[in-house]
Amino acid sequence: MSMIQADGLTFSYPGSPDPVFRDACFQIDTGWRLGLVGRNGRGKTTLLRLLMGEYLHEGNLISSERFDYFPSPVPEPERLTAEVLEDLCPEAEGWRFPKELSLLGVEEEALWRPFSTLSNGERTKVLLSALFLREGRFPLIDEPTNHLDAQGRELVSAYLRRQRGFILVSHDRRFLDGCVDHILSLNRSGIQVQGGDYSTWQEEFDRRQRSEEARDERLRKDVKRLRQAAARTSLWSDRVEASKIGAYDKGFVGHKSAKMMKRAKSLAARQEKALEEKAGLLKDRETAEALKLSPLDHHARVSVRCSELEIWYGDRRACGPLSFSLEQGERAALEGPNGSGKSSLLKLLLGGPIRYTGELALAAGLKISYVPQDTSALRGGLTESIRARGLDESRCKAILRKLGLSREQFDRDLADYSEGQKKKVLIAQSLCEQAHLYVWDEPLNFLDIDARLQIEALLEQSRPTMLFVEHDRAFQEAVATKTIRL
């Protein structure tokens, strides 16, 4: 196996005052199944793009590998899927296509359908298979789970576990645990490489933080004690100096004064050393402040009621018949495979032009806050976006700061935000809305793990009435009080 090495890697986006990487150094083996983790905006996708040679940088980034990036664009998507695969990996023999796709749960007939007619999950699996069908390429896989249902994530995780050598960006904890054997984390103070899965890395990271917190507390007490001792020594020294006036044994007094001055210097040196050590601690601690939400109470006990509900796409039934009720304080997870009508049901609740039969009843005057999957509508200034929705600007920006966005980020065009940062904007705006019901469609796509944990804690503590779609199993199990299966 060969190595990928960075030595003094430095990179900034044009016009940005802060570098994404400054003198970064790391070394990784191309035989590793490497998980790349870090908060949104920390530079995960940027690092992949640097490896692809798309950006100019300072320092050295050395590798003999030829890299392939996922997701890759598909020109002429109206062509048959088999033709798309032939173009992406011309050296692969045709019989390998159905074999590889079967490992990902894709039927062979998908090869003879236009690529454009495949579901988002099927497209993801086809493009992933192409990565490993190409010879002599090292895969760089950026967020493959965003369009995959729970079963699809399990299949892709098992598929990647069979492979050898790739870099994977993902924020799904269980998905990472299932398929990686090393972690490269982009921390606040630099880059760390560690063997093991994500949970192993997180346990070690937390252990190190606890150790540093304990050391920080001991040093804080030491500094306080040394300052008090220095103050006493200074007071004693002043008194001794004063006693020299008219003292009979001036040699004795001078010797005593010199000893105290020496002790004072020693205390000052120890204090400075303790402060230096203290300054080197906790540089990687992520400050994840608690979020707050105050949902509105509704006079009706039941917020949503469906009876024999069926959703139709033309003459095809997408889902149903479906019967359920959602009471105040319940957080219901909509569960079903890709294409089962989950997003359509949410849009129907919002009054969208969705054809349905059966009964759907919402409580009178029900106010709904919605987080869509798609972030493409976010453009222009953040302040203008907040004001356009009639929201409290200060509160919304305070939430975004808690979710890890810097104040400098607020001045940038929303179109230049990373996908994870855009999702944080949508979630922050939803949390600022006064609503009886929160409807969130795959809110965690592209969202970093720290933000996921913050949102988990918020929803468990504030207990809003909620209907959501989310394929992150750990999040769903932590948040949902009931599951509605389509």
Please place each PLM-identified region on the residue numbering.
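ABC ATP-binding cassette signature C-motif
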Residues: 1-212, 298-486
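Intrinsically disordered, low-complexity boundary segments flanking structured domains
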Residues: 56, 134, 274-278, 293
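Short, highly charged low-complexity linear segments
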Residues: 61-63, 233-243, 264-265, 282-291, ...
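Extended, highly charged alpha-helical segments
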Residues: 76-79, 83-100, 178, 185-287
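Coiled-coil termination/hinge junctions
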Residues: 279-304
